[in-house]
Each structure stands twice: as C-alpha cells, then as structure tokens.
Amino acid sequence: MRQFIVQNEQAGKDSTRVITLFNRIMEQEPDEAQLPLLYAQYLLSKGMNKEAGPVLRQVLTIDPTNTAARMTLLGEAVRQEDYKEIMNLCEAGVESNPDMLEFYFYLAIAYNQAERTDDALAICQKALSHVKDDSKKEVVSDFYAIIGDAYHTKNLHAEAYAAYDSALVYNPSNIGALNNYAYYLSVERRDLDKAEEMSYKTVKAEPNNSTYLDTYAWILFVKGNY
C-alpha cells in the first residue's frame, strides 16, 4: 500500500485513487491497526483532518494502546478546546497507556475546566505515582502546580503552598505556579517579600503579560510600595 501511494504521488495523480482503495480496505474491517493508521496519516498529509478523525477512532477500537492515533486526536481536541472529547480520550488513555503522563496532564486541565476539582486533584496524584527518573521535570512541576490550584480552591491553603513549593523545586521557572503562589500569599497578607520576589520573576519573564503585571502591582500595593 505504501508503494502504491508513492507511485501515485510520483505520477502526479490526485488522491482519489488512493482514498478509494483505502475505503475498500476499510470496508473489510481490518483487525490490525497498521493500515487504518496509514490511511489516517495519508488523510492528514492531504489536510483532510475531519476525514481522518473516524479512521483514527477505528485505529483505537482495534488497538487502544496506539499512542500515535490517540495523541493525534487529542491534539485536534485541544486545538478545538473540546474538553469533553479531551476527557474521553484521556480517560481511556490513562487506562491503556498508564505511563503516558501527557494523558494525565490534559485530563487534569479538562477536569479543571469542568470545575471537577476533586477529579483534577486525584488524576494529578495518580500521575505522580507514574513519574520516573527520566520524566520531564517541567511536566512533574505542572502536576504539582495543578494540585496547588486545586487545594487552594478547596481552601486547603497549607497543602496548596506545599504543592507550589514542590512545583518550584522541579521547575523554578514555572511561571504559572510563581504567579498563583505569589498572588495567594498576598491575599493572605503573608510572606509578602517572598510573594514580591516570585511575582517579579513572572514579570521579568513575560513583561507584557497583563495578568502578571496586575499581580505584581497588587503585591506592591499590599506592601505599601506605591
């Protein structure tokens, strides 16, 4: 099939012949994922993302552990901000590929968007149980940052600050964690020097970010430096 695609491309012919042949193959309901995945990749190469979606889902029906298909569908769901679809893909993803931290991460974000705080907290804690020595520190940091946000939503401030501290151990430049940690400290009127230092780092990193500028200005106001 690959050779047929190459020959078709080299001959300068349109994609109709290739797609027709693939559709005939798909009608036979193949029990291996290789050909459907090749078909999906071909459709994507032609910019036919919408048509590729059902084919990729068929790949997952045949082989739920196929990360290429799931990640491609997930990428499209993220671009569309389709949080329900993100949940569907990632809930299945953490079961079929429990060591893929990306599925936990996007699932936690989707749960947050749905205001399912306890679920976001639980999935992040589950993700941390799968962290290995070679896991990306930035990703681990993000999980702790989400945990911090979740604990703060539940008014568990001490637990939130401990989670933010862990986030910054793994990635001292985690801008989101720095900003939220600084802001929440300032609201409580505690550790204001620490809050100012953290907030300053966010402004230095992204000087045109209005959210970080507002946090920094607020902390200075609370400290009386205005």
Regions found by a protein language model. Give the residues of each.
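Residue-level recognition of tetratricopeptide repeat
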Residues: Q41, G75, I109, D149, ...
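Structural motif corresponding to the intra-repeat A-B loop/turn of tetratricopeptide repeats
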Residues: A11-G12, K46, Q80, A114, ...
